[in-house]
Amino acid sequence: MTLQLARQLGVPEVEVIRALPDGRAVELDVGRWEELIRALEGLGRAHVIVSNGCVTCEVNGQFGGFSTWGEFFNVQSKSLDLHVRHAELAAAFAVEKPGHMDGVNTLSVQFYDRSGAAAFKVFLTFGGQRPPAERVAQFEAIRQRFRKT
C-alpha cells in the first residue's frame, strides 16, 4: 500500500503517488476540485476510503446531495456523508495500480491535503474483480477531462 511505503521511506504519501511508474498516476487539476467531486456522482456507487493514520473508514456509496457550508463542501447522499475542507486540498490524481491484496488493477481518484496525506480516495474498482469496460471508460473520461496541464 502506498501509505505503508511512504512511512517506510519517511515521505508524504503524495510523493509515493507522484513516483508511480508508467503513467499509473495522472495528476488532476485540483483547482477544479468542486467540478471534479461533482463529476464523481456520474460514477454511481464507488468505494470511498478515508484514513487519519489511526483509523481507516471504508464505505460503498454514491456521490450526490452537494452543498457548501462555511469552509466545507458537503456530499450528503443516502449512502455517503462527507464534509471536505476544500481549502486543504492540494493535489488530486487518477490512479491505476495493482491492488495490494490480489494484484488486480484498481482505478481510483485520490485527493491529498497540504501535508501530502490522503484526504480521501474514491475507488471505481475494488476487491479483485477486473473492471467492466464501462467503468474503465468512466475513469478514462475523468482522467482526460481533469488532467493537470
Task: List the predicted regions and their residue ranges.
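Eukaryotic intrinsically disordered, low-complexity regulatory linkers and tails enriched in Ser/Thr/Pro
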Residues: 1-149
